[in-house]
Design a protein with these regions (language model features):
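Active-site neighborhoods and metal-handling regions in enzymes and metal-associated proteins
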Residues: 1-219
Length: 219
C-alpha cells in the first residue's frame, strides 16, 4: 500500500544528500528533494518537518533560507500520500563528520526503534511500544518527550498513538510507525514504518534506508 511512497522518499533523501555542498541554502536543498518526489510520484500530497541546526531543538517546523554549517543536524520527517495511503518516515543528517556525542545519540535512538519493534506484535497494546522505546532513554538518563509512533493509513497520523498508558490494542494487518528522537544540544529523530503481522512487525523502510550513520553524513 505504501511501497511506492517509501521508495520515492528514499530516492528523494538520497538526491538531497548527493546534491549537498556547503553554501547551498536549506531552500535550495529542499527543492532537490521535492523535485525528486514530483518526478517519481506525479500527483501526491506531502506534510513535513524540515529543520536545521538550532531549529532541531523545536522538534517540528520548517527552517527557511538557512545556510547549513559544519556540526549541524538536519531532521526531515516526511509524510507522503499517494493512491489514498500515507507513509510517515524520518531521517536525520549530519553536516560533516558526526561528533562522538552525535554518534552516541544516533545509536541510542536506532536501538530504541529496534526495541520498539519487538513490542509491536499481535496481542500488544499501544503503551507497550512507548515503554520499550523509552527504556533506552531511561538507561541513558533521558526521556522520550513525544509519542513513540502511531497508526498510519488514510491519514498521516491516526490513533492509537504510542503513549504511556494508552491501552488500545494493536491490530494485525494495520500499518504503524515507530518514532524516536532526542532534542538537547542538537536534535536527532528516526522513524520507520511497519506492517503488523501474526508473526511480528515487518519493517518496510529499513532495506531502503539502513540506519548506518555514515549514510547520513552531508559533505
Amino acid at each position: 500500500m505504501i511501497k511506492k511512497q517509501l521508495q520515492a522518499v528514499s530516492n528523494a533523501y538520497k538526491a538531497l544528500k548527493n546534491s549537498f555542498v556547503l553554501g547551498k541554502t536549506s531552500d535550495e536543498l529542499f527543492e532537490v528533494f521535492q523535485k525528486t518526489l514530483d518526478k517519481e510520484l506525479g500527483d501526491y500530497e506531502m506534510v513535513y518537518d524540515y529543520i536545521w541546526g538550532i531549529d532541531t531543538l523545536n522538534i517540528d517546523g520548517v527552517t527557511k533560507n538557512y545556510i547549513p554549517k559544519e556540526g549541524d543536524t538536519l531532521i526531515m520527517d516526511i509524510s507522503v500520500k499517494k493512491d489514498g495511503f500515507w507513509c510517515d518516515v524520518c531521517r536525520s543528517f549530519f553536516v560533516g563528520a558526526p561528533t562522538d556525542e552525535q554518534r552516541k545519540v544516533f545509536e541510542m535512538i536506532k536501538q530504541s526503534l529496534r526495541e520498539g519493534q519487538k513490542a509491536l506484535k499481535a496481542g500488544g497494546k499501544a503503551c507497550d511500544i512507548y515503554k520499550k522505546v523509552n527504556t533506552m532513554y531511561e538507561l541513558n538518563g533521558k526521556t522520550l518527550v513525544h509519542h513513540a509512533g502511531h497508526k498510519i493509513g488514510w491519514e498521516p497520523l491516526m490513533q492509537p498513538q504510542f503513549l504511556q498508558g494508552n491501552q488500545t490494542p494493536l491490530v494485525v494487518g494495520e500499518l504503524y510507525t515507530i518514532e524516536s528522537g532526542l532534542y538537547e544540544k542538537f536534535g536527532i529523530r528516526l522513524e520507520n514504518n511497519f506492517l503488523l503481522t501474526e508473526d511480528g512487525a515487518i519493517d518496510l523502510f529499513e532495506d531502503l534506508m539502513p540506519l548506518k550513520i555514515e549514510e547520513y553524513v552531508l559533505r
